[in-house]
């Protein structure tokens, strides 16, 4: 959600910073602990607002789900990746008698990469991650160029 919105802003040439609050999936929606974001928000944002940002880049900030006094500091991190394993489809009938389908992703234990945002959050830090919009996988360019080099036309 927040990173998607920041991507749209960056594509439009707007300085883009995504602010996200981490929270436990259990009891989701009951109470989200915004203490860390409230106490640390200005400290995190000031340097980001004062610095120059390269075109087509954005910043992703994640606040841990802990009390503000327990935050250990701020880490500049790499982007981490969750492995959600296999999805499942849950079928049900709504109160009006219509069928519905939920597609669920089941989080599995993760081992966050070193210097990743996931590691920082797990360790009690606020993560600040610079992201870029050029998603080109440079290492594959030569391989793909070689695979298509012999083709001269559509025929």
How should these model regions be labeled?
Residues 7-33:
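Glycine-rich phosphate/pyrophosphate-binding loops
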């Amino acid at each position: 959600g927040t990173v998607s919105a920041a991507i749209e802003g960056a594509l439009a040439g707007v300085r883009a910073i995504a602010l996200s609050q981490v929270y436990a999936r259990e009891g989701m929606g009951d109470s989200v602990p915004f203490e860390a974001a409230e106490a640390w928000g200005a400290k995190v944002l000031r340097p980001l607002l004062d610095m120059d940002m390269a075109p087509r880049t954005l910043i992703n900030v994640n606040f841990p789900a802990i009390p503000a006094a327990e935050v250990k500091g701020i880490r500049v991190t790499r982007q981490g990746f969750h492995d959600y394993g296999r999805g499942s489809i849950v079928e049900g009938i709504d109160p009006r008698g219509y069928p519905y389908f939920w597609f669920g992703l089941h989080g599995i234990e993760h081992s966050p990469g070193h210097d990743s945002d996931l590691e920082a959050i797990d360790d009690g830090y606020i993560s600040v991650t610079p992201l870029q919009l050029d998603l080109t996988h440079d290492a594959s360019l030569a391989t793909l160029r070689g695979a298509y080099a012999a083709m001269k036309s559509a025929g």
